[in-house]
């Protein structure tokens, strides 16, 4: 039996070639886990003769799945790689749900509600005037129950208090309402696929379809996802799970790092292989990371090591306040940039909470440092995209009341509040969807003539788009729809600033282009399938990693990334670790979050904290984080004790570099 042709270390090679049963790969930060998954797929297909169509690799983000597909195509060739299922958990759940929708009580053309739409449904089901924060909390609780694989019919087992009991009663109404809309939320993609797999015939069908399963970022799985994997892997455990218990930082959204141990309990024959050689960071960074995370309990110990040399000492910088901290970071970036230590894109500034970014942005702008702030408004949350997506959702699923209400009078077509109220009343009386009510002459007969005519034209347009989108070219149907509603003219009326208008028009063009690309990938699919795929996406190709800019992002957002130079701001008590997490007993997860931040650095790492920070309009004294005490003193280089002199040097250094920039640009 031949072995993988690409160069692997001994532990990676063992993980790739092991097929004797279920396997857990404990892959430390920067140890090449994605490489192992790619090479194992190649090994299974080319060396073990398993058809690519029988192999599935599951990850958490569209970006990771896309990267995996591209790397597989480079190793297997496009034709073989296309046969392999590479998807997110939610995409896989969508495949199962769509294949067995009748068994689960759904009709064709299921809509997938995003977070905003789902929250709107919850708001409408709660008493009028319910505070927005209560709506958000109720929706979050429903999500937690679903992530724990609790269905609305489970006899209130999820409720732990009187408040939760009320939300549990809401759960059944919410589930019924979504079923009437022929819609699901993102959590349902896992929960409903679990329901389908309870059927033995369905389960056997999928176990035959997926003969080997590989799972990335396994430590981030929640209860529902774990059960899904168990059902697909079967009793013999045709599974390789790759994860790192030290990087489990999503407990707040249901992730259970204990799922690593549960694998051993459920599969006594489980093989465990550790990947401990780090290919990213220098030795000093790894020694600090190892020392920090050693304060957390471990079922299986591992210590990262590197052959890249020691690198720079870790700098710890006390600052007077957050403004001095931001100025210091900006000045240090300028210094490294202009002494040949790297380009703008080699620097990242990480922090615990989004609220820390404002003062950092200001400092970078003052020094004319180009930067990119991660975590802005999602493409699909933009008004123009939500409008057009709702038109298309309604075209493939006329039961989607949420979509109907958003677009029936957008752009304005003389269907006012009173007319919409009449349609809603008629729909409620006859227990039908809003769109079906709008198509009925008896409903429209009571409306003003102009409103009735507009509503009839609207319904005809939606029906025609749905029909053409399935029978003919779906992209032409989409373009004709957008032209027919004169959406571009509507945007021009609604948008005052030319720059903003052009951005919104470009977003519309990008949406059509994205649909075109999806259609070209699978030419035989109609609009219903295209919409299902599009609804699962969270970002577009145009949201590529920014080049040539300093990156500002939260610690959570930095996971999976690496940078030559990393600044970790706000390493203070009540911030890192966060006060709320300490109150909830989550100190270990906060330590893992710090560990993730440290291990993003390749060559240099700077940790900073403020001695006071402005909170709620007042200056509050801050203490250095307890995590600093857990780092070996010999690895740290503390900046001088005289803060005022240090801050003066910081300002002077920044001023010198700014003058250089002015000279460079001829100012």
Label each residue range with its predicted role.
Residues 1, 635-667:
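Acidic, low-complexity intrinsically disordered tails
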Residues 2-3, 20-23, 41-211, 237, ...:
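A basic/glycine-biased coupling hinge at the interface between accessory DNA-binding modules
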Residues 4-20, 224:
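N-terminal pre-P-loop "Q-motif" helix
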Residues 21, 50-54, 81-83, 117-118, ...:
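Short glycine-/polar-rich loops that comprise or flank the Walker A/P-loop
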Residues 25, 29-37, 41, 52, ...:
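Helicase P-loop NTPase motor core
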Residues 29, 210-221, 225, 245-246, ...:
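Conserved Walker B
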Residues 31-34, 219-298, 302-307, 425, ...:
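Conserved helicase motor core of SF1/SF2 NTP-dependent helicases
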Residues 160, 212, 343, 357-369, ...:
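Conserved helicase C-terminal RecA-like lobe
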């Amino acid at each position: 039996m031949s072995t993988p042709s690409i160069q692997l270390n001994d532990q990676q090679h063992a993980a790739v070639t092991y097929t004797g049963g279920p396997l857990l790969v404990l892959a430390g930060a920067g140890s090449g886990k994605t490489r192992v998954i790619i090479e194992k797929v190649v090994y299974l297909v080319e060396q073990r003769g398993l058809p690519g169509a029988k192999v599935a690799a599951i990850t958490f983000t569209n970006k990771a799945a896309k990267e995996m597909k591209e790397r597989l195509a480079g190793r297997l060739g496009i034709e073989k790689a296309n046969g392999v299922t590479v998807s997110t958990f939610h995409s896989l759940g969508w495949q199962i749900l769509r294949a067995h929708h009748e068994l689960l009580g759904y009709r064709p053309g299921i809509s997938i509600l995003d977070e905003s739409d789902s929250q709107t449904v919850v708001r409408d089901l709660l008493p009028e005037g319910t505070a927005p924060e209560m709506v958000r909390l109720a929706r979050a609780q429903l999500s937690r129950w679903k992530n724990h694989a609790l269905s609305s019919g489970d006899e209130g087992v999820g409720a732990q208090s009187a408040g939760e009991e009320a939300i549990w009663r809401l759960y059944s109404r919410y589930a019924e309402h979504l079923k009437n809309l022929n819609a699901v939320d993102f959590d349902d993609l896992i929960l409903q696929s679990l329901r389908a797999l309870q059927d033995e015939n369905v389960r056997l069908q999928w176990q035959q379809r997926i003969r080997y399963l590989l799972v990335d970022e396994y430590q981030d799985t929640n209860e529902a996802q774990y059960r899904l994997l168990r059902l697909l892997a079967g009793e013999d455990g045709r599974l390789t799970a790759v994860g790192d218990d030290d990087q489990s930082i999503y407990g707040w959204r249901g992730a259970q790092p204990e799922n690593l141990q549960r694998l051993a309990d459920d599969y006594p024959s489980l093989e465990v292989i550790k990947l401990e050689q780090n290919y990213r960071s220098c030795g000093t960074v790894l020694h600090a990371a190892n020392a920090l995370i050693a304060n957390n309990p471990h079922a299986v110990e591992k210590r990262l090591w590197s052959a890249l040399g020691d690198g720079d000492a870790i700098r710890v910088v006390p600052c007077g306040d957050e403004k001095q901290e931001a100025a210091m970071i900006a000045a240090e970036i300028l210094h490294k940039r202009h002494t040949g230590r790297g380009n703008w894109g080699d620097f990242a500034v990480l922090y615990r909470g989004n609220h820390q970014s404002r003062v950092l942005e200001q400092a970078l702008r003052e020094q004319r440092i180009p930067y990119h702030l991660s975590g802005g408004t999602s493409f699909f949350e933009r008004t123009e995209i939500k409008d057009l997506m709702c038109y298309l959702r309604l075209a493939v699923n006329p039961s989607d009341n949420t979509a109907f209400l958003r677009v029936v009078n957008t752009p304005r077509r003389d269907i006012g509040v009173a007319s919409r109220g009449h349609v809603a009343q008629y729909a409620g009386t006859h227990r039908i969807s809003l769109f079906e009510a709008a198509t009925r002459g008896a409903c429209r007969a009571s409306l003003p003539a102009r409103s009735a005519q507009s509503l009839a034209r609207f319904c005809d347009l939606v029906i025609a788009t749905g029909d053409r989108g399935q029978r003919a070219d779906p992209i032409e149907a989409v373009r004709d729809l957008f032209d027919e509603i004169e959406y571009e003219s509507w945007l021009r009326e609604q948008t005052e600033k030319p720059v903003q208008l052009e951005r919104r028009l470009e977003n519309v063009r990008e949406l059509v282009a994205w649909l075109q690309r999806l259609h070209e990938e699978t030419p035989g699919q109609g609009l219903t399938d295209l919409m299902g795929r599009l609804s699962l996406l969270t970002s577009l190709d145009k949201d590529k990693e920014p080049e040539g800019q300093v990156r500002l992002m939260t610690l959570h957002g930095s996971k999976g990334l690496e940078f030559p130079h990393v600044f970790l701001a706000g390493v203070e008590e009540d911030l890192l670790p966060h006060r709320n997490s300490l109150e909830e007993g989550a100190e270990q997860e906060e330590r893992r979050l710090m560990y993730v931040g440290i291990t993003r650095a390749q060559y240099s790492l700077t940790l900073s904290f403020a001695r006071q920070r402005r909170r709620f309009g007042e200056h509050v004294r801050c203490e250095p984080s307890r995590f600093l005490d857990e780092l070996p003193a010999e690895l740290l280089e503390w900046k001088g004790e005289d803060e005022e002199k240090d801050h003066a040097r910081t300002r002077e250094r920044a001023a010198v570099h700014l003058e250089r920039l002015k000279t460079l640009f001829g100012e």
